[in-house]
């Protein structure tokens, strides 16, 4: 089966929402039906962007240190990683008519940096104007989760935690509300799923919906 066009799918949600798991499962399912698909993530996805990711996520400052990344420094790092990702991963995928599944994209910046940390929305929009061009996701899945359950999942993670796994419960509540608010503004391209349902059932529901868009 041959891809007819570039198709861009994004998974969004707070830490512990299951978005990384579902993005991997969708990638495998699409690959099985013979379509050309890549799985990527933000921040990251390319060699340069992964280096920036290390700077963003590593806790460089001791807990008792007064020195922290300013919220605009933090945001600019994310946007720099995004530009690298778009130039070196997304744009080549467009030219090759690939399906791209991305674990996080622009809505995470708005939910975390704008709504969560108070970064000026116009500042982010201005930078996006230059780095995004006409690139927009065709489908975005927002995975809604019970915050307490998400925090429990984070505690059980065997991988090394980063500073974004250590925010307060109130911050995650605020971020999740932001994701849902964003999704409700464009119901044609956003799909909100409650991740409290069975993982396998959710996996099947997402694939069925994506398949209906890819194969017409």
Residue ranges of model-derived segments:
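ATP-dependent small-molecule kinase phosphotransfer cores
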Residues: 35-132
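A glycine- and Lys/Arg-enriched "phosphate-lid" helix/loop adjacent to the NTP-binding pocket
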Residues: 104, 109-177
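NTP-dependent small-molecule kinase module
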Residues: 2-3, 27, 148-216
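Conserved lysine of the Walker
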Residues: 19
């Amino acid at each position: 089966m041959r891809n007819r066009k570039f198709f861009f799918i994004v998974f969004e949600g707070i830490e512990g929402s299951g978005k990384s798991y579902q993005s991997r499962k969708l990638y495998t399912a699409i690959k099985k039906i013979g379509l050309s698909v890549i799985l990527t993530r933000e921040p990251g996805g390319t060699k340069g962007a992964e280096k920036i990711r290390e700077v963003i996520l590593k806790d460089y400052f001791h807990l008792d240190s007064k020195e922290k990344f300013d919220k605009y420094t933090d945001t600019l790092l994310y946007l720099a990683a995004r530009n690298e990702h778009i130039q070196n991963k997304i744009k080549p995928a467009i030219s090759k008519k690939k399906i791209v599944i991305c674990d996080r994209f622009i809505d995470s910046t708005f939910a975390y940096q704008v709504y969560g940390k108070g970064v000026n929305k116009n500042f982010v929009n201005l930078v996006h104007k230059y780095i995004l061009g006409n690139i927009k996701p065709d489908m975005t899945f927002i995975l809604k989760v019970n915050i307490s359950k998400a925090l429990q999942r984070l505690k059980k993670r065997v991988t090394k935690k980063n500073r974004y796994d250590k925010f307060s419960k109130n911050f995650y509540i605020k971020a999740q509300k932001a994701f849902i608010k964003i999704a409700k503004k464009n119901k044609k391209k956003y799909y909100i799923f409650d991740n409290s349902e069975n993982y396998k059932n959710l996996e099947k529901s997402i694939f069925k919906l994506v398949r209906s868009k890819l194969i017409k």
